[in-house]
Amino acid sequence: MMTSVIPRGFPPRQYGVPGDRSSSLGCKRGGLARGGGGDVKDDFKRNTGNSARPMYSIVIPVYNEGSRVLSALGSVVGCIRARGWDAEVLVVNDGSTDSTADMVRAFARTAPEVRLLENPGNRGKGFSVRSGMLLARGGVALFTDADLSAPIEEAERLFAAIRQGADIAIGSRWLEKDRQTQRQPLYRQFFGRCFNTVTRFVMRLPFADTQCGFKAFTRQAAQTVFQLQTIERWGFDPEILFIALKRDFWIIEVPVSWAHDERSRLSYLKDGFKMLQEITIVRWNAFRGRYDKPVDAPPRTGEKQ
């Protein structure tokens, strides 16, 4: 019998109660409810004679990433092949106006692991992640940023947490600060910490880092959480964590290596107010019972999607 071992130096924080909660999630059998993936164009040509699913799905939202998307895909596919992962890569194009989509298509012709999804225009990072996670075929789905601030090799730390029984594993930049190989400028650290503190207080989230764009979900957790997600832009991370806790999923927060990318598009000054508005929307949704609705159960492995 094979046992999985969490990597050395792995002091995770755990939230929620482990165990089988399928009977308490309000799931029902049937097709997936329309979520972010409903209107997304999928370049993947399904082979109806082969219903096998990969073990892992890696979702990468992109918007005007022509300067680095090929490098990112090279790193991700190289890691998949070097480690022998049974994985697919879903690149979700959020209405890019540069050559991003064409570059991904060209890369995919030489890398069968890669498939391109196209949003109906520019809808936001939250929409892109939701689309990719709902269309992911893997037993475990992870989303990561195109800048690979968390090296894709760190995904193994999240996968290990899920093999140990977690429903969701989230990367954290703050549990082990010495794992940051390139720190943010002080002003970004300050605003980031302020936003994280406000978010944790308003939404009663216990996590050290809500905003790290490196999170992995079991298929059931992903299909439940992302069907209920409503925030489509930067503030979606706190919402999906709020939903996950509300639906009683077991979450492990895992320290990961991380390097700040100066090309990051998130501006805490410009986007911070909008994100604060979005967390108040989440609280309002919770008050109205938006996150208590039953959701469709995902097809079992081997069923056609």
Report residues per predicted region.
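Short beta-strand-to-loop acidic/aromatic patch adjacent to the donor-nucleotide binding site
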Residues: 139-147
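Hydrophobic helical membrane-anchoring modules
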Residues: 2-21, 27-29, 34-56, 204-205, ...
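Acceptor/aglycone-binding surface of glycosyltransferases and processive sugar-polymer synthases
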Residues: 119-135, 140, 152-234, 261-270, ...
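Short loop->beta transition adjacent to catalytic acidic/histidine clusters or analogous donor-positioning motifs
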Residues: 54-56, 77-90, 99, 112-114
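Conserved donor nucleotide-binding strand/loop of the catalytic core
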Residues: 87, 101-135
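Acidic helix N-cap motif at the loop->helix transition within catalytic regions
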Residues: 67-71, 98-106
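A conserved acidic beta->alpha catalytic loop
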Residues: 93-101, 148
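Short, well-formed alpha-helical segments that are part of the catalytic scaffolds
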Residues: 65-80
